């Protein structure tokens, strides 16, 4: 069935209030917030909804909804300036699942590593292939931070090594490490959903018996590894630098991402005393910081 979409421009101060009003008072089926001016949002606090200075609101209604009523309610709310601009358009129904699946293709990292959705044919059956579908937790290889970490892992000799994936998300880095030769991987994440997603993806890839998964409070005492990869955010990389450093054996390797180019030098300074750091690698304004422990 067709749908009707209303598009409005708001600010970070009133966007949530407008969205709530549209849901509660006009029967909107869903509300989407979009960046109106290509402005990045950095690291919201836990439980916080961080919005752009100028935010587009998309409200979706069924085809029978009374748009005159919706606009009247918006005017009456006084949440927007008088004469506010808006756009109403009809959206034809689509096979959204098929369209979503069509957007994901096998991706190559380095010379031998591929990340493949399960519904696609594997391009190189003899390569190192990780089967991973977009799902509940962050990390499918499409984001530059994940890509930077995968390329780094692919370039290491992981044969027989122990690896810690700190902030394992979907488990993509942990699974890739096993497929690239690591003997054992320990995945750690603060989100129980990420632990479940990692476990499910490890099972799909036939490596569940080689990956241990823990919430931070449950991880083994004295945990130490040859290789540690932490694809999280700049704030936690600073705050947890002592913990992350302690996970790396002397002469072990560390890589971190989830860091913007404007944050990279500052984050690196937290590790410079304990590590011989490599040159910072950048991809689409995201960075990887890596090095060997002294």
Swiss-Prot record:
Main localization category: cytoplasm
Enzyme Commission number: 2.1.1.-
Annotated function: Methylates ribosomal protein L11.
Reactions accelerated catalytically: L-lysyl-[protein] + 3 S-adenosyl-L-methionine = N(6),N(6),N(6)-trimethyl-L-lysyl-[protein] + 3 S-adenosyl-L-homocysteine + 3 H(+)
Family matches, as Pfam families: PrmA
Gene: prmA
NCBIfam families per record: prmA
Domain of life: Bacteria
Listed GO CC annotations: cytosol
Natural source organism: Aliivibrio fischeri (strain ATCC 700601 / ES114)
GO MF annotation, one: protein-lysine N-methyltransferase activity
Subcellular localization, as worded in the UniProt entry: Cytoplasm
Chain positions recorded as S-adenosyl-L-methionine binding sites: 146, 167, 189, 231
Biological classification of the source: Bacteria, Pseudomonadati, Pseudomonadota, Gammaproteobacteria, Vibrionales
Family assignment from sequence similarity: Belongs to the methyltransferase superfamily. PrmA family.
Keywords assigned by UniProt, alphabetized: Cytoplasm, Methyltransferase, S-adenosyl-L-methionine, Transferase
One GO BP annotation of this record: methylation
InterPro entries linked: Ribosomal_L11_MeTrfase_PrmA, Ribosomal_PrmA_MeTrfase, SAM-dependent_MTases_sf
The name this protein goes by in its record: Ribosomal protein L11 methyltransferase
